[in-house]
């Protein structure tokens, strides 16, 4: 057996920085070619995010409207299909729209299995089935696809681990810059928990207030036997998924994810990762509402944490997962990381995204955390993740 790993990165405009390393890149760089204790081979595909190559205007357009998302999903699927043999373990990682890519890839595998090499010419049929013909989640099996299209796949393939940082499904298009309806063409991707997944981990940003970067949480129902962990961390989108030059805060969710994947068998070179004993709970966070997204400073969106509602006022907005009819969806196994509890109501620095330098210090509090820390109280231990 071997381990087949796909790492899907975000886009350049997720953090406003085109050069700093994300957590996806750092995980990919830390993966051993072989597992030292049992000699298991590990092969890795790293996919740069859409909008990260070409001329600047090309990157702007591609990154903003999500061109290339479909291509990345199909490319990753081809890589897995060309290398997979029964018994292999599959690990998927993603950040931002790369997380959306990784979760969509998991949905494609769950719906169609992994096409056998000699049947890869049927990938367009698998894509069509997943894109436009798939029944409601959890009401299908790969056998439905195989029968319909008379093809063959590894229909019982499983995804050992799916680790994502702050999934963005709405593509992050600045309002008025590009057609608002563009995001709807990506709505077909199945980003709910899928039956082919064994363990899913999702790191979420408490302090991301851009309306077009609202997260896509995993929501009920979850298939039997699928373990889901969704944990909230301090900071903006790039403080959780990486990508800022000042990145000490992003090391916390990176180490959390690395440990979870390692527990499921992934072999990592910890000399390429932060030392777990050196993490800084009071490291600077970032204000992502700048540049193209400066309008969000005047009309911030607050993410609901642990499904605890709170009052917003003026131009503030609250985001909670809803279905197409506006009904609240039940999220799966949300917790708050212990580092957040350690930081709350303590002085901490805030960095400017434009200059990426510390410009101020303030007591760390957040409107969406206020229901969790009433008065001088603290969170129940059951709601805290390590």
Regions found by a protein language model. Name each.
Residues 1-386:
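Active-site- or binding-pocket-proximal scaffold segments within functional domains
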């Amino acid at each position: 057996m071997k381990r087949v790993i796909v790492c899907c990165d975000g886009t350049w405009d997720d953090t406003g920085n085109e050069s700093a390393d994300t957590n996806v890149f750092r995980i990919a760089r830390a993966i051993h070619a072989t597992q030292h204790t049992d000699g298991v081979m590990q092969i890795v595909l790293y996919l740069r995010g859409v909008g990260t190559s070409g001329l600047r205007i090309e990157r702007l357009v591609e990154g903003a409207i999500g061109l290339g998302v479909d291509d990345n999903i199909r490319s990753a699927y081809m890589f897995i299909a060309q290398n997979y043999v029964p018994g292999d373990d599959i690990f998927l990682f993603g950040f931002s729209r790369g997380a959306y890519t990784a979760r969509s890839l998991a949905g494609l595998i769950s719906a169609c299995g992994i096409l056998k090499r000699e049947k890869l010419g049927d990938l367009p049929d698998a894509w069509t089935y997943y894109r436009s013909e798939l029944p409601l989640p959890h009401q299908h099996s790969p056998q439905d696809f195989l029968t319909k299209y008379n093809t063959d796949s590894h229909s019982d393939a499983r995804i050992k681990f799916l680790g994502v940082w702050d999934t963005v499904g709405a593509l992050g298009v600045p309002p008025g810059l590009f057609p608002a309806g563009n995001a709807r063409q990506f709505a077909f991707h199945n980003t709910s928990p899928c039956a082919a997944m064994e363990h899913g981990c999702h790191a979420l940003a408490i302090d991301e207030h851009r309306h077009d970067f609202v997260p896509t949480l995993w929501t009920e129902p979850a298939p039997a036997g699928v373990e889901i962990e969704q944990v909230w961390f301090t900071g903006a989108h790039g403080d959780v998924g990486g990508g800022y030059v000042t990145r000490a805060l992003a090391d916390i969710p990176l180490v959390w994810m690395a440990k979870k994947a390692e527990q499921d068998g992934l072999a990592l070179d910890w000399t390429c990762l932060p030392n777990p004993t050196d993490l800084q709970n009071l490291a600077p966070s970032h204000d992502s509402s700048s540049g193209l997204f400066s309008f969000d400073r005047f009309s911030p969106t607050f993410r609901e944490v642990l499904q605890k509602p709170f009052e917003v006022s003026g131009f503030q907005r609250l985001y909670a997962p809803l279905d197409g009819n506006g009904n609240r969806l039940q999220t799966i196994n949300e917790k708050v990381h212990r580092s957040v509890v350690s930081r709350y109501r303590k002085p901490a620095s805030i960095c400017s995204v434009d200059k990426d330098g510390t410009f101020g210090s303030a007591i760390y509090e957040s409107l969406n955390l206020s229901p969790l820390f009433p008065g001088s109280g603290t969170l129940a231990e059951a709601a805290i993740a390590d």
